[in-house]
């Protein structure tokens, strides 16, 4: 941009110099024309003097001596006049040559002036094109800066969501471990209850065999059986609840893994878009 401005200033300076040279050439031309006019006037005056001398020579040709002297004087004047005429002709020729050179300089100056004006016009058009491109580039950079800020915000949101999902996953994994421990504990208790049920069943069979002997204890045994049955149902209910909890947690883990995968894909896409925007800004 500074180089173009310097070039514009140089072209303007060349234009001003060309105008000055053109004005100087015009002044030289006018001065040469004035000198040529003066020399032509002097030539006409000398021609008039020569004619007067010739007339005077004719007038006094009748007087031999005077005529001879006057003739010699007239011839001398004529010779001087011819010399003056020749000198004037040479001066006129020099003035004409100087006038031709001045006209050539004027034509050269005018041509340079025209070329300088064309170059200045082209430079102005180039400046306008460059300014338009610079304005478009600035607008594009502003848009890319806005897009970059938005991409950074999106990336930051994605990072926060990713961290939140990771924390949730850690919590769920911990809950899953505890649920698995409770399920194992429930399974152990179920096994114990099954063993206890078998023992109770065996005892019940033994009691049934001795029912007649121990009929007075029947109510007590029935109550024990009911209590044991309730404990068995409770254990089975707890085992079913543990199984449903494990199933629900497994589904939650699957959903979170899907969400985590989707967030990773989104984060990857945002990172690629951000890299692309940074590459565009770097290339600019």
Curated annotation (Swiss-Prot):
Gene Ontology MF: a single term: identical protein binding
What are the entry keywords?
Answer: Acetylation, Actin-binding, Coiled coil, Cytoplasm, Cytoskeleton, Muscle protein, Phosphoprotein
**Predominant location category:** cytoplasm
Example of a GO cellular component annotation carried by this entry: cytoplasm
Top-rank taxon of the source lineage equals Eukaryota
- For the modification Phosphoserine, the affected residues are 45, 174, 186, 206, 252, 271, 283
Give the induction note: Induced by hypoxia. This induction is reversed by exposure to normal levels of oxygen.
Q: Which residues form a coiled coil?
A: 1-284
Residues with the modification N-acetylmethionine, per the entry, are: 1
- Report if keyword Transferase is assigned: no
Using the UniProt annotation, give all residue ranges assigned to the region (Disordered).
Answer: 13-38, 53-82, 116-141
Q: Name one GO biological process term.
A: cardiac muscle contraction
Q: What PROSITE patterns has UniProt attached to this entry?
A: TROPOMYOSIN (PS00326)
- Which positions carry Phosphotyrosine? 261
**Compartment annotation:** Cytoplasm, Cytoskeleton
Biased-composition ranges, Basic and acidic residues, are 53-80
- UniProt key word Phosphoprotein: yes
Q: How does it assemble?
A: Homodimer. Heterodimer of an alpha (TPM1, TPM3 or TPM4) and a beta (TPM2) chain. Interacts with HRG (via the HRR domain); the interaction contributes to the antiangiogenic properties of the histidine/proline-rich region (HRR) of HRG. Interacts (via N-terminus) with LMOD2 (via N-terminus) and TMOD1 (via N-terminus).
Per the entry's comment, what about the domains? The molecule is in a coiled coil structure that is formed by 2 polypeptide chains. The sequence exhibits a prominent seven-residues periodicity.
Q: Which family does it belong to?
A: Belongs to the tropomyosin family.
**UniProt function note:** Binds to actin filaments in muscle and non-muscle cells. Plays a central role, in association with the troponin complex, in the calcium dependent regulation of vertebrate striated muscle contraction. Smooth muscle contraction is regulated by interaction with caldesmon. In non-muscle cells is implicated in stabilizing cytoskeleton actin filaments.
Q: What is this protein called?
A: Tropomyosin alpha-1 chain
- Organism per entry: Sus scrofa
Q: What is the lineage of its organism?
A: Eukaryota, Metazoa, Chordata, Craniata, Vertebrata
